[in-house]
């Protein structure tokens, strides 16, 4: 990212109204103020942020090794500085990983055939396009809304992986100060809504592959359908289940399933997940009370499936346990704290409720199970 050349020095007069200034230093392009805050941290940021932002600076509060209060002003970032090689490298790696996983797992191309003619792997391009299309649309929704609100956000980082989808998803980094609850809400909600729009396009795509029955026997993984997928499939008359349990749906549908599942996980109302940002914008500090319930609920769900329903750890039990642990850790960090805490209007609040409702339609108790054919 390229730094904006500030039009002037940081507005020291504004800072001194809430900060007893001892010393000012310039370090690595930043202006660092040492002293003693006269008000609580959040109040200081709220008081000085508008003037600093107008002058072209982000402002942060910290403390020194000598227990002095420190205010750091750094030039605001905007645009892209040079070629984003890390983003490009991860994207290309994920294209390759989803292509390989798609070819061997969902198109049933033998390894020997791929070795003999590597171009046969290109048959899995529809799967790769579906998966990456959903993920990138989701993250670009965050990115574009962040740029709209003038918040420093990174380009998406797509994470390659192995079976069963070839990716762990995608993330962006929010590096700038969050100006208000409206910006926090808009950035948080843009990703899930954009991703679900892409998921709808994927599941209704005319580029389908006829279902085929698997010839081999033994154990196979079954991806059960969330309600939203069944609703979309009903509209286009495309079956997602078959009388023969060995029949495999179109890999395009698998891309839609993945988009819905990632949306569900992202809408968990904890920490830096989209749901955490959205609920923080909607409820303010009350979001923390809801966040405490999430890990407990996920562990309870895993226990219910294992001890009452008899599902194994390698089915959805392990999945919910993992997300219970992950949500426990990320809940401690919490979502971004906006400078301006003015509540949202009714329109945004209703959009938030609608977004969580769509997320609920992506939920099912047992997303993954193992069956013996």
Language-model-derived ranges and their functions:
Residues 1-373:
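Hydrophobic transmembrane alpha-helices and their immediate loop junctions
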